[in-house]
Amino acid sequence: MYKDNPVYTVKTFSSRDEWLEARKRGIGGSDAASFVGPDVKPFKNLLQIWQDKKGLSKPQLDNEAMAYGRDMEPLMRDMFAIDHPDMIVLHKEDCMLVSREDPHRFYSPDGLILHGDRKGVYECKTYRRRTSAQYEKDWGIQWNSLEHSIPDKYFCQILHGLLVTGFDFVVVHCLVTHSDGHHEIIERWFDREEVEDDLEELKRIEDEKWEKYFVADVKPPLEVF
């Protein structure tokens, strides 16, 4: 799965710094929410992403949450593999899957899953619960269905992963730290066929804004969260 195929090519880097530099040349999974806009509460607005990719911003230093998430990722991935012995879970460090159809779109998955003849993406998250209202909005049952939610910015990211890979499903595997210190593991599964309309819409938005601002070298407007 970490091999060149008709859908994507695989680029491997010698260091994390080299990988970070390569991310300036296109749209990565963590950029997707910024392209969608402030309604999905991205970590950065599109102007900040534009400045990052143009080399106009200072390198971002790890904060405590980022370091914790990166340290927990291999442990979470191993836990998931143990909990799902019928699945093969693979991972390759400092690599990038690049879409053949749209080379400006790439993805660095936390893992890839083989389940019989189905291929999936593994996405690992850590989440600190601060308020009950926000937790219910991000992870609770939707008011109009029996489906459980995930944060909007994570949903944009997994859609982006499906666009690049063409895979059948995504698993979001999250370690939640509650305000009293106890932990909870959450799994959310999404089949590609359930999100086809969302995939088309994200592709349209990403391609339109990539051409309008990044290819044309036009500074995007400041979006207020």
Regions found by a protein language model. Give the residues of each.
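Short intrinsically disordered terminal tails
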Residues: 1, 224-225
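Extended hydrophobic/Leu-rich segments
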Residues: 2, 13, 19, 195, ...
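Generic low-complexity segments that are intrinsically disordered, proline-rich and/or Lys/Arg-biased
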Residues: 7, 86, 221-222
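Generic structural marker for isolated residues within well-ordered, non-membrane alpha-helices
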Residues: 47, 77, 158
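Nucleic-acid nuclease catalytic cores
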Residues: 66, 82-109, 113-214
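Inter-domain linker/hinge segments that demarcate the starts of reverse transcriptase
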Residues: 71-75, 79
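Residue patterns forming the tRNA-binding/recognition surfaces of aminoacyl-tRNA synthetases
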Residues: 213-224
